[in-house]
Amino acid sequence: MAAKLIKFDQEARNCILKGVNTLADAVKVTLGPKGRNVVIEKSYGAPLITKDGVTVAKEIELEDKFENMGAQLVKEVASKTSDVAGDGTTTATVLAQAIYRQGAKLVAAGHNPMEIKRGLDQAVEALVAELKNISKPIKDHKEIAQVGTISANNDKTIGDIIAEAMEKVGKEGVITVEEAKAMETTLETVEGMQFDRGYLSPYFVTDPERMEAAMDNVAILIHDKKIANMKDLLPVLEQTAKSGRPLLIIAEDIEGEALATLVVNKLRGVLNVCAVKAPGFGDRRKAMLEDIAILTGGKVISEEVGFKLENTTLDMLGQAKKITVDKDNTTIIDGFGAEADIQGRVKMIRAQIDETSSDYDREKLQERLAKLVGGVAVIKVGAATEIEMKEKKARVEDALHATRAAVDEGIVPGGGVAYLRAMKVLENLQLAPEQQFGVNVIKRALEEPIRQISQNAGVDGSIVVDKVKNGKDAFGYNAADDVYVDMIEAGIIDPTKVSRSALQNAASVAGLMMTTEAMIADKPKEEGAMPAMPGGMGGMGGMGGMM
């Protein structure tokens, strides 16, 4: 086992503080509307220019192992806040630095770190309750756009597009962010249920210009096995042909004789038909077929539940007002499923989302949920250069997360004002004298976000803090225009979830760092002397004539 380096007490805490300060000082310059850019060298390609706190934090690795531990702990604050709320990473970093810096001074002066941490925890609990208390639910399109605009570093276009996307697909809907081929940032929405499987043969196309099959008032056959044999499929084809309705077949696969017969019937005009593969794989495929069946009011024709393909009748088929199928996707619009059945299915998927511990499963379940309740919106991000594209895409994703957070838990005045307003709740806390130091640490730290926003805008932070503290409600400092305004009326708002998560995560990690008594790191290996050269090259004597 490799030898270790160990540091104790004040020496350990000082190393942590150096690391925390190095990382936080690099991150906090990006805070607020007048936040500065950070340029990051990349091992390949052009440098990355960003104003995103978590991106800056992720790039930082320090040479000193002990200082690096401090930096990595604060990095965890930024990452956790980003994961939970999607924004607030810089605020969380600023808070963590302020709490730890104040706390480390008190511990160095001989105060009990465990008691300080207890006071800290109780103060945070009271503050979180107060933030929820002053939170306002988000009501309309305009407020959603404001949250999106602020999280996208005051880019109004992005805010408006996110608000429009949420309006179209609902708060349960899936909104994805992709890179556009053009310069403009646009929004595309897909109504109804779409899955990523296209037609099995181009002969099914009804619109050669757009290369898609579009059919109205469609019957839908949903089968969970391969169809290769025509005789199994014949009875249902005959019934559908008699009814005169177009038919969409969704099955694990359709091949050989069955596919050839469908194509021939389509070309002869006997039957308007289209065949696609079932979406997903394994158990997820079964679940998605069941979703389609419920949405269209049909049944999954599966031998597992006693339905054979050859015995299928028209009443087992799903129905939809319209379907469109291109080479990659199938979209089912206005299925005939019963509303009560769809809501029951939605409830079941929501329960599974709450229970699952896998992020991948949760994402897939949310996609299924969105397909049942709303639809899917795609924000296509356009930019002039690749560097701008990456930066803009990251901002859109941030803004999207923050907007979802605002819809979840409401909004509070932005620009660090909410923390100053929530501070009054700390006056009522009756704690032991040592624990009261923890409360004082938090009080001082809560001023730090607004102080940093002001400093980044080139204004004296202390004057701004004092003026805003003496104001009421949403009165605060608009750093973008250098004026004092009602923050909510001016549209400077933060999602409650973001403010809450930033404070909780910062206090949690700062409290742990404060109560650290020892640090252990691997001892760096000493570089030995160069090994001797192989025989014949000793001293390279034979090359003397080259001097």
Curated annotation (Swiss-Prot):
EC number, as in UniProt: 5.6.1.7
Main location: cytoplasm
Reaction(s) catalysed by this chain's protein: ATP + H2O + a folded polypeptide = ADP + phosphate + an unfolded polypeptide
Single Gene Ontology MF annotation: ATP-dependent protein folding chaperone
This protein's GO CC annotations: cytoplasm
CDD domains for the chain: GroEL (cd03344)
A Gene Ontology biological process term: protein refolding
Binding, ATP: 30-33, 51, 87-91, 415, 478-480, 494
Highest taxon in the source lineage: Bacteria
Keywords assigned by UniProt, alphabetized: ATP-binding, Chaperone, Cytoplasm, Isomerase, Nucleotide-binding
Matches recorded under PROSITE patterns: CHAPERONINS_CPN60
Subcellular location: Cytoplasm
InterPro entries: Chaperonin_Cpn60_CS, Cpn60/GroEL, Cpn60/GroEL/TCP-1, GroEL-like_apical_dom_sf, GROEL-like_equatorial_sf, TCP-1-like_intermed_sf
Function text: Together with its co-chaperonin GroES, plays an essential role in assisting protein folding. The GroEL-GroES system forms a nano-cage that allows encapsulation of the non-native substrate proteins and provides a physical environment optimized to promote and accelerate protein folding.
Subunit structure of this chain's protein: Forms a cylinder of 14 subunits composed of two heptameric rings stacked back-to-back. Interacts with the co-chaperonin GroES.
Entry-linked NCBIfam families: GroEL (TIGR02348), PRK00013.1 (NF000592), PRK12849.1 (NF009487), PRK12850.1 (NF009488), PRK12851.1 (NF009489)
Family membership: Belongs to the chaperonin (HSP60) family.
Protein name: Chaperonin GroEL
